[in-house]
Amino acid sequence: MAVSASPVISATSSGAGVPGGLFRAEPLYSTPREPPRLTPNMINSFVVNNHSNSAGGGGRGNTNTNECRMVDMHGMKVASFLMDGQELICLPQVFDLFLKHLVGGLHTVYTKLKRLDISPVVCTVEQVRILRGLGAIQPGVNRCKLITRKDFETLFTDCTNARRKRQMTRKQAVNSSRPGRPPKRSLGVLQENARLLTHAVPGLLSPGLITPTGITAAAMAEAMKLQKMKLMAMNTLQGNGSQNGTESEPDDLNSNTGGSESSWDKDKMQSPFAAPGPQHGIAHAALAGQPGIGGAPTLNPLQQNHLLTNRLDLPFMMMPHPLLPVSLPPASVAMAMNQMNHLNTIANMAAAAQIHSPLSRAGTSVIKERIPESPSPAPSLEENHRPGSQTSSHTSSSVSSSPSQMDHHLERMEEVPVQIPIMKSPLDKIQLTPGQALPAGFPGPFIFADSLSSVETLLTNIQGLLKVALDNARIQEKQIQQEKKELRLELYREREIRENLERQLAVELQSRTTMQKRLKKEKKTKRKLQEALEFESKRREQVEQALKQATTSDSGLRMLKDTGIPDIEIENNGTPHDSAAMQGGNYYCLEMAQQLYSA
């Protein structure tokens, strides 16, 4: 990588000379591939300002380590510093430019650096300021690391190899499968199948099954199962009759996502119409027997069944069915699709067996006589009774390839009275619409002796299944309405219970307030009684003291009486009465106190 001659950008410890236009609110690297937007005017202004600052400051910093150069790396301009003779580049800048789309984040890069034994250099404050001014790092970042070119190339190679390994592992997990089991389908594969299925096979799903947002998961799963069951049924029927001994794998359908062309070619090579032998002659004879139909190709039901096998448009699903609304539940749709798959597989097996049966080739005995050496397998088949169709039993044995055994077999077939279906003219067949045409594998329409009974039966069964699904949907809707009514009644009951509880709570709160008021009154009366009791106790003490004094005065009177002083007796005549009155008042107070305590 050639280093381009770029201007040297230096800085000092003061950042006053940096223009304000270099600091941006938005990050410069919005995408991994976007280079830093450095115009020549910005670089020149930055250089002039920094040279003026360095001339005025007198070399206050180490200019050797703070000289920033814009070097060319993988076609991008990257900021670099020259330290100890090594060129170091900004690690966050090269991460945004080259590594962001390869790894999960910058922490993954640091983990890889530890594993690779690479030690990045931590930037100084001046270097961080320079890188921030150039826009190499975010405006709010105050830390940065530098890495050499050699270490970056090692890191870039490791990240690229790791991503390639992840992609190869993911592809192997999608494409590989164990015998007898389909490959694991990831979410992305299912979404890709859903996207391609609507374009590659337009008539495979009814428009009623496709919601406004896309194909539902149940419908997608049933459609994939339908394709796989068809392919497996045809491989089972054609396994013994194929000449080259090649069998198609059921998993090819899943590995070839949306590839309708390759799967069509493969089915065309293995279809009973392209098998070598008498059937190929039947096809050409049928083609030769139609001189100019007038540009309106026809298809009988057997050919339509074969088209179903080759994953083409379903004749009964090309138009939206009136019994299939969009709002059907997924369970009913899945059940109906499962039954349709089963019935369709049975119809395809019966159609293929009729193609291989000897009675379908009875009208072409001339072709058999012309090529008597070609092998003609004739498996035995017993058809079940179908409504609206003729009941016939076919009995045949294995026919050898020698001419004598062939003639003997033809004689036995002539002896057995079997009603051979009459070949109908092409005008009596079902005609395609003007917008429809045969695929590339069919050069012209085919004629086979078959009736519409199988398709009618299949359509009748499908209609019945759709009716059942619709009835189930209606029943579920009724159940939902009934549940809604029950929930409403229960809600009303809960509301009534809640209102009753609220009333009871209000009554209880009111009674609580009344009880609190009564309690306050009782406390007030109790306080008054205690005060009265204290007052009475004090009076009692006073009365007792007075009684004591009265007793002492009585003893003094007696002494005076003994001495014979009459005046003192006259003065003290009223003292016994007074003491009796005082005792009576004391008893009254005690009775009042007892009454208060009892109350």
From Swiss-Prot:
Region (DACHbox-C): 453-533
Keyword terms: Coiled coil, Developmental protein, DNA-binding, Nucleus, Repressor, Transcription, Transcription regulation
GO BP: development of primary female sexual characteristics; regulation of transcription by RNA polymerase II
Record field: compositional bias (Low complexity): 389-405
Residue ranges, compositional bias (Polar residues): 237-262
Pfam short name (any one): Ski_Sno_DHD
Gene3D superfamilies documented for this protein: Ski
Domain of life: Eukaryota
Disordered: annotated span: 166-186, 237-280, 370-409
GO cellular component: nucleus; transcription regulator complex
Family: Belongs to the DACH/dachshund family.
UniProt remark on domains: The DACHbox-N/DD1 domain forms a structure containing a DNA binding motif similar to that of the forkhead/winged helix domain.
Quaternary structure and partners: Interacts with SIX6 and EYA2.
Name of the molecule in the record: Dachshund homolog 2
Organism from which the protein derives: Homo sapiens
Name of encoding gene: DACH2
